[in-house]
Amino acid sequence: MRDMDSTARGLGDLLARHEQAGAPKVLSCRPLTGGYSRVMTHAVVAWPDGREQALVLRSDPPPEEIVYKTDRVAEWNVLRVLTEASAVAMPPALYFDDGSHLGAPTIVLGCCDGPSLQAASTDAAADLDSFAEQVADTLAGIHSVDLALFDGALTPPGDWESYVNGLIDEWALAERAHPESVPVLRYLSAWLRAHRPAPMDMVLVHGDFQASNLLVKDGLQAIDWEFAHVGDPREDLGWFSLFSASISAPNLYARDPESFLARYRARTGASAEAVNQATVGYFSVIAATRVYLSILQSAAAMAQGKAQGVMLTYNLNACALGNFNWLSICQSLEGAL
């Protein structure tokens, strides 16, 4: 766990470097729970004019505890563009440290004090229909961001067919690289290739769009952009549907998937041929590629004595459950694609 005294000193040094005319004083730092793969810290600073501001620090964990290997510089570049363009409702990205001050690459963001959508939707008084509409609208907004804004911060992957084939190939390649045989990966790769749906235009994809990464404050605010990339919009739809089915909170997609997708199509102009329950089901498998294979790589590293941590062990359960779920999805979609 990060030492809060050294974090406070490092944050103070970082702010002093950026705010030379009047740097704030760091009043407090405390660990934030809920961060799944990053080290999260809540800080409060006081500015010379008397104003207090809450900040959130999002840092890399020690190398041996990394569950998902993602790039803080790449994430910062995406967040910086989105913040400067006010393109998506989200906590603003304010500062970046390459590790010189805080000991690890760290993004400093404004703090949104709203609850997660996952927590808010369990309230007995929650308007779940309204939440579902807001989710569809938020996702449509992300997918409508002009890719030209990124100008090198995100690299377009090329044509749709090559991109999707590349994602499909990752399943078989991961099986070959794994220390033991995982035949389900070969099966998924072959099934996905044989059942590809119609292509769509490439868009900004959040990459981990789920209820716990949406904060309820003046609508919905999207957080945790470490998997952001240019890809097929149905990746986010598929991941949201898959994740929503695996948590105890109300499933905002499954309560009325036709209405959810109709609202999304109305906001984006997508066709019913391209965006429907079958294609979302297909992409619920595709969307899991990066997360699942990262867990698999971490599991292999742990078995080889190269990694450790409670989260790595915990995530092994996700591998077994994922295999069962994806095979079930493939079976249910036979004849629909």
Language-model features: locations:
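Phosphate/pyrophosphate-binding loops and the adjoining catalytic core of nucleotide-dependent enzymes
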Residues: 2-5, 30-31, 78-79, 337
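An alpha-helical support segment within catalytic cores of ATP-dependent transferases
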Residues: 7-23, 133, 144-207, 269-272, ...
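Conserved N-terminal boundary motif of the eukaryotic protein kinase catalytic domain
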Residues: 24-30
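ATP-binding pocket architecture of kinase catalytic cores
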Residues: 30-166, 173-183, 199
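ATP/Mg2+ or Mg2+-diphosphate-binding catalytic cores
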Residues: 252, 271, 291-337
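All-alpha amphipathic helical-bundle segments outside canonical DNA-binding/catalytic cores
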Residues: 272-286
